[in-house]
């Protein structure tokens, strides 16, 4: 014995399937059951059928994602504690080094060595300040110190440490090449 709701649902599905078969639209999935499709190319079923309430069971059920993007060559995994990392080999944990990161690290350490520490604010070069002072002292104002005295008072003190022998920024102007190919003489950096 069928109820009225069953008859309506069955009638609707039969009419819907008949309409899909008789129509000449390009969409094949309207009105068809996608579970009956045997050519499921993009569907993946997990062999795990248990509850997913624990993190370990969830990790087992999910497929392992090998890379974040096509440029990332390593594996990505989060750790709750450092003791979990002891079982993995070091090569799986380290990020491979490329030329850009090595050059950036070398320039950063050289900049720290030249300035005598990490500075968050850019400072004016001693040479530029002494040239401005020298221009104003040549105008006849004797109250300002001469260029040589000013240079001696503003020369940064050098510290010997893990960076080896450092040279003041003023004594070693460097030439950098920009992306456009122009040379820039940089005294501060």
From Swiss-Prot:
Residues 33-44 have a biased composition (Acidic residues). One of its GO terms (cellular component) is plant-type vacuole. The keyword Secreted does not apply. InterPro entries: OxStress_Response_Reg (IPR051992). GO terms for biological process: response to oxidative stress. Its main location: nucleus. The keyword S-adenosyl-L-methionine does not apply. Keywords: Nucleus. It comes from the Eukaryota. Residues 22-49, 128-147 are annotated as: Disordered. Coiled coil: none annotated. This is Protein OXIDATIVE STRESS 3 LIKE 2. It comes from Arabidopsis thaliana. The lineage of its organism: Eukaryota, Viridiplantae, Streptophyta, Embryophyta, Tracheophyta. The gene is O3L2.
């Amino acid at each position: 014995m069928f109820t009225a709701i069953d008859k309506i649902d069955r009638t609707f599905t039969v009419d819907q399937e008949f309409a899909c078969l008789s129509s000449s639209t390009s969409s094949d999935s309207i009105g068809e059951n996608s579970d009956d499709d045997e050519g499921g190319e993009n569907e993946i079923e997990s062999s795990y059928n248990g509850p997913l309430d624990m993190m370990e069971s969830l990790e087992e059920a999910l497929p392992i994602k090998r890379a974040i993007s096509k440029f990332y060559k390593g594996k990505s995994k989060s750790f709750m504690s450092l003791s979990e990392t002891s079982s993995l080999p070091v090569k799986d944990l380290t990020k491979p080094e490329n030329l850009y990161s090595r050059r950036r690290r070398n320039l950063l350490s050289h900049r720290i060595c030249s300035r005598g520490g990490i500075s968050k604010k850019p400072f004016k070069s001693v040479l530029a300040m002494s040239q401005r002072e020298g221009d104003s002292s040549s105008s006849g104002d004797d109250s300002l110190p001469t260029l040589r005295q000013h240079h001696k008072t503003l020369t940064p003190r050098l510290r010997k440490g893990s960076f080896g022998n450092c040279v003041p920024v003023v004594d070693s102007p460097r030439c950098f090449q920009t992306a456009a190919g122009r040379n820039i003489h940089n005294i501060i950096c």
